[in-house]
């Protein structure tokens, strides 16, 4: 992500509420209708069927929630499908509830999705029958600590109160992997607080926790709030020394920087990134998967108005979802897009 794009983030983020309210249905618990699986023409069709479709997103102050609401609006406005987006705990929970047919589309970190299809981590012993619509933008692992905590590296988490994200979230997955890579036991060495982002930010402000791990796009509204409120009292932690150990677990992890302009910090912050993917069940019709995938890229400009992370949507990298297989309908759409 370029620095110039980051500098426009605050203005772009200001449009989130206006563009997503009609698409966000709050927390939901429903059984998926036939829209996701229903046929819509022949094998070469790329037209969505009529019906209802729901999208599992993430915490209300995170990028999944913002883009999920925008995606729901785009789907409803341009197809016969009526889409809603729901606030959730994010990646692990999203995949579990996608498989249980409570949602039809799910945002997920690529490392969590890889665990799901290979039966590892939270999915030990039971693989999830899901496919990818596309690889989308990348999540930045944002480790923020109070300066008075004395934390300068993940090894310093020992004995500290650290928010590791919502239960069953992708943030919790990578937080625990970071702690383990630092030679610590998440259950014994760290006072892990399993908080959503809103509660995490509040806890940082009132001093009831020493630091946080968050995995999200740039900028994340909750982190912007924290940095604006606490300014020089907080700082990012460089986690890149742990990257080799993380890559031993999953090669999807890579190094990048959080540009200083993102949150108004004194300097760029080195960190670890992981791609995001949009997932569906394998039983989604080829026509629906094709139509939805094509729509994401055709309406990229509309999604950019919701959140600048959508600027990273690229058909050239969208197929890179291994080990999660692309849905056949999505493959057709991406082949057509070139």
Named regions from a protein language model:
Residues 1-11:
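Bacterial N-terminal signal peptides that target proteins for export
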Residues 19-23:
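C-terminal motif of bacterial Sec signal peptides marking the signal peptidase cleavage site
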Residues 25-28:
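Bacterial signal peptide processing site
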Residues 34-56:
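N-terminal low-complexity, Pro/Thr/Ser-rich intrinsically disordered segments
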Residues 50-78, 82-83, 138-206, 316, ...:
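Bilobed "Venus flytrap"/periplasmic-binding protein-like clamshell domains
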Residues 67-74, 84-126, 143, 151, ...:
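Pocket-flanking alpha-helical
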Residues 110-112, 119-123, 149, 186-278:
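Pocket-lining segment of extracytoplasmic ligand-binding domains
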Residues 269-271, 275-338:
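Segments of small-molecule ligand-sensing domains
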């Amino acid at each position: 992500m370029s620095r110039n794009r980051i500098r426009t983030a605050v203005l772009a983020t200001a449009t989130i509420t206006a563009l997503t309210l009609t698409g966000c249905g709050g927390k939901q618990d429903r059984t998926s209708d036939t829209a996701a699986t229903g046929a819509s023409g022949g094998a070469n069709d790329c037209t969505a069927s009529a019906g209802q479709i729901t999208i599992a997103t993430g915490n209300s102050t995170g990028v999944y929630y913002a883009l999920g609401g925008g995606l729901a609006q785009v789907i409803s406005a341009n197809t016969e499908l009526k889409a809603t987006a729901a606030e959730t705990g994010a990646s692990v929970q999203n995949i579990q509830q996608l498989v249980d047919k409570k949602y039809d589309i799910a945002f997920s970190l690529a490392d969590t999705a890889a665990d799901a299809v290979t039966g590892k981590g939270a999915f030990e012993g039971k693989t999830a029958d899901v496919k990818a619509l596309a690889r989308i933008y990348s999540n930045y692992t944002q480790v923020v600590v109070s300066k008075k905590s004395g934390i300068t590296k993940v090894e310093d988490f020992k004995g500290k109160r650290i928010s590791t994200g919502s239960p069953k979230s992708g943030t919790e997955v990578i937080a625990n992997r970071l702690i383990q890579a630092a030679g610590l036991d998440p259950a014994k060495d760290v006072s892990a607080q399993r908080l959503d982002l809103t509660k995490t930010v509040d806890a940082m402000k009132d001093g009831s926790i020493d630091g946080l791990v968050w995995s999200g796009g740039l900028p994340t509204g909750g982190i912007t709030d924290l940095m604006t409120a606490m300014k020089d009292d907080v700082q990012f932690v460089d986690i890149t020394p742990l990257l080799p150990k993380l890559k031993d677990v999953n090669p999807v992890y890579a190094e990048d920087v959080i540009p200083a302009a993102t949150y108004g910090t004194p300097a760029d912050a080195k960190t670890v990134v992981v791609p995001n993917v949009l997932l569906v069940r394998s039983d989604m019709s080829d026509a629906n998967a094709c139509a939805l995938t094509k729509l994401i890229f055709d309406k990229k400009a509309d999604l950019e108005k919701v959140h600048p992370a959508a600027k990273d949507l690229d058909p050239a990298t969208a197929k890179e979802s291994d080990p999660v297989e692309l849905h056949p309908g999505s493959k057709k759409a991406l082949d057509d897009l070139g």
